[in-house]
Regions:
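Acidic, Ala/Val/Gly-enriched low-complexity intrinsically disordered segments
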Residues: 15-19, 26-28
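Compositionally biased non-globular segments, especially hydrophobic aliphatic-rich helices
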Residues: 19-22, 155
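Positively charged, amphipathic and often flexible ligand-engagement surfaces
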Residues: 27-335
Length: 335
């Protein structure tokens, strides 16, 4: 196991080091192999134990995760707000199978909403339904999520429901639509790498849904998702145009400068004002680009994760961008 981990790390150094070079089929294939490997490792307790032996690794995770406590996330968001950047709290945790544990997650999100109000933060919240009981029962999950959305409504705040692996998509959309029938302060995430997403967006726009569009970060089979990055990018651009012409306020979640430039150009061509949508990015990734977009007059929201269960989230971030792997490895070697 550990020998395989070391070989993967050596491979990742090579792929990450070349990540900023000119794209070609070989490089893109290598990136896809690396992504698949890191997504598999995101579920490995043994690999987590191996990595967390290194203090330098634990230190570098703070680049991408605000900390383990709510106070850490509050401070991180306060700093972002001072730069003109909005935020979205995410208490890390997923695949919870205990009803009691799902209640604890609800209580944590109620604390988050109280804290946003008390600290006058420019932030909403993001939730994963597997945190809130989706793997226990759909009705429990709906009830738990409704409590959070109702509490947010009392503060005139907003709740974004994250999308997880494709087997969860139908149930996630069903719960969202039930909530949207009662509340306006709830939105959903759609993943551009899924073939079904164009039809899902068309249906969601009919009910006025506010959508965060992302590319997708899970390891999906070719039967349900585009396997090639070029196809994902093309679909992301297509869906971006669909959202921007809907007249509804949406979020475009990407760190890809080509996707951002295409969205900017499309908005200019159709005279869509910069305050009619927002760009969204992840905490600690492309901070230079986040601040640049704000200076140019665009709205920017950063997804700020915190909590003890940071490992799967962190590994997915490494899987998404080889440059992140290089950053982590370089800092570990310095430590």
């Amino acid at each position: 196991m550990l020998r395989g981990c070391f070989l993967l790390l050596r491979w990742s150094i090579l792929v990450a080091h070349r990540a900023n070079g000119s794209p070609n089929p070989v490089n893109e294939h290598n990136k896809m192999v690396t992504k698949s490997a890191f997504l598999s490792l995101s579920k490995s307790d043994r690999f987590k134990t191996f990595l967390t032996r290194f203090q330098s690794f634990n230190n570098v995770t703070r680049r991408f995760v605000a900390g383990e406590d709510l106070a850490d996330a509050v401070e991180a968001i306060r700093v972002l707000n001072q730069k003109g950047i909005s935020a979205s709290f995410d208490h890390l945790g997923e695949s919870i199978t205990s009803e009691a544990a799902t209640r604890e997650e609800v209580n944590e999100y109620l604390r988050v909403l109280d804290s946003i109000e008390e600290n006058k933060l420019d932030s909403n919240v993001s939730v994963k339904l597997t945190q809130l009981g989706l793997d226990v029962s759909q009705e429990l999950c709906y009830s738990n999520t409704r409590r959070i959305v109702e509490s947010a409504a009392a503060y005139s705040n907003f709740v974004r429901i994250d999308m997880e692996e494709s087997p969860k998509t139908d149930a996630t959309l069903e719960i969202f639509k039930r909530l949207r029938n009662e509340f306006e302060n709830v939105g959903i995430v759609i993943q551009a790498y899924l073939y079904r997403s164009v039809k899902d967006i068309e249906e969601l726009l009919k009910i006025g849904a506010r959508i965060r569009l992302c590319k997708g970060a899970y390891n999906e089979p070719a039967a349900v998702a585009f396997p090639e990055k070029a196809d994902v990018d093309a679909n992301y651009s297509k869906l971006t145009k669909l959202l921007l012409t809907s007249g509804i306020y949406h979020g475009l979640a990407t760190h890809d400068e080509n996707m951002i430039a295409a969205a900017e150009q499309f908005a200019r061509e159709l005279a869509i004002a910069s305050d009619k949508f927002e760009f969204q990015m992840l905490y600690g990734i492309r901070r230079d680009l986040q601040e640049k977009l704000v200076r140019e007059g665009y709205r920017m929201r950063v997804y700020v994760p915190y909590g003890r269960y940071w490992y799967p989230y962190f590994m997915r971030r490494l899987a998404e961008r080889p440059a992140n792997i290089w950053f982590v490895l370089r800092n570990m070697m310095r430590g």
